């Protein structure tokens, strides 16, 4: 009873704090109020409180249930929200410049936690005895790496999608201008790196001409930060996803006698891994660097949700123990 009450208190505290912080982040991000230092710092401290609240929630559930809290969809969503909070903490300690990563991590954490604590999953918060397939020491290793990988890849993909939107708004012609052909638009979209390098050089020239605070310069700095963080966060998420898939193979061999069973969850995880491997290849290989890598990220963003929720919605395969239909 005590653990259950404590769990509810921590859930409400973390959700209330992050709900209060979210409008502050959107306001400071859109209006660009750098002079309101205390206002922005207070929102950062709110996310720190949320991080410790979710951490306490997970530890409380761990002690109460007697196993690592990653046995169903509700617990994995809370852990995913915690993963976004960790990514936010990284940007919190980077005080050298204004970081737009916060505008992605804060709403992601609140939306995921809000969905987990909503009425859609009202039967799942109660902790239950693990099914035999999950009673293994590989549970913590495999599932935690996969969820951390999902969180990092989702965050990096959202940054790339934001980069894609900014680029699309720049190159898309007005609907009344018939002189600009669709082919030119597609060339701009699929060869973004070349376009970005040209614009950055142009902005540097403007900076030398005392136009460093112009609208184009501000936009260039935004694009540079989005590209910087998306590549590094996706690289980290790719490592987590790789370790998660490898640990799953070892666990599957111990449980079912086969390293790979082409289960729907395994298949979609492999497809997701392949897409982000292509993205990293594009970013690190100069010969194919002209391809618009954020488009690959956008595809990967959709694949992650298919991999994460697809099996749970269908309720099929070896990973159907945490599905909606099973509850």
UniProtKB/Swiss-Prot annotation:
The chain crosses the membrane at residues 13-33, 46-66, 73-93, 101-121, 146-166, 226-246, 262-282, 298-318. Signal peptide: none annotated. Coiled coil: none annotated. Keywords: Chloroplast, Cytochrome c-type biogenesis, Membrane, Plastid, Thylakoid, Transmembrane, Transmembrane helix. Its main location: plastid. Belongs to the CcmF/CycK/Ccl1/NrfE/CcsA family. This is Cytochrome c biogenesis protein CcsA. It comes from Draba nemorosa. The lineage of its organism: Eukaryota, Viridiplantae, Streptophyta, Embryophyta, Tracheophyta. The gene is ccsA.
């Amino acid at each position: 009873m005590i653990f259950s009450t404590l769990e509810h208190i921590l859930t409400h505290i973390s959700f209330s704090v992050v709900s209060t912080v979210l409008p502050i982040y959107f306001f400071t991000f859109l209006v660009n109020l750098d002079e309101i230092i205390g206002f922005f710092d207070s929102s950062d401290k709110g996310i720190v409180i949320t991080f410790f609240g979710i951490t306490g929630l997970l530890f409380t559930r761990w002690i109460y249930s007697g196993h690592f809290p990653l046995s169903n969809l509700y617990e994995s969503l809370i852990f995913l929200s915690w993963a976004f909070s960790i990514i936010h903490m990284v940007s919190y300690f980077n005080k050298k410049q204004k970081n737009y990563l916060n505008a992605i991590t804060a709403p992601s954490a609140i939306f995921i936690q809000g969905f987990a604590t909503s009425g859609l999953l009202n039967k799942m918060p109660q902790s239950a005895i693990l099914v035999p397939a999950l009673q293994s020491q590989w549970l913590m290793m495999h599932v935690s790496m996969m969820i951390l990988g999902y969180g990092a890849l989702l965050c990096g993909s959202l940054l790339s999608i934001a980069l894609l939107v900014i680029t699309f708004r720049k190159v898309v012609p007005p609907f009344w201008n018939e002189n600009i052909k669709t082919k030119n638009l597609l060339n701009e979209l699929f060869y973004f790196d070349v376009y970005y390098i040209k614009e950055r050089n142009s902005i540097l020239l403007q900076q030398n001409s005392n136009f460093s605070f112009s609208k184009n310069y501000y936009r260039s700095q935004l694009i540079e930060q989005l590209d910087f963080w998306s590549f590094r966060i996706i690289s980290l998420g790719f490592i987590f996803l790789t370790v998660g898939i490898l640990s799953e193979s070892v666990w599957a061999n111990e449980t079912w006698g086969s390293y790979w069973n082409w289960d729907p969850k395994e298949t979609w995880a492999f497809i997701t891994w392949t897409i982000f491997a292509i993205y990293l290849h594009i970013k690190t290989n100069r010969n194919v660097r002209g391809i618009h890598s954020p488009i690959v990220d956008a595809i990967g963003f959709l694949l992650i949700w298919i991999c994460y929720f697809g099996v749970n919605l269908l309720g099929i395969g070896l990973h159907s123990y945490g599905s909606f239909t099973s509850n």
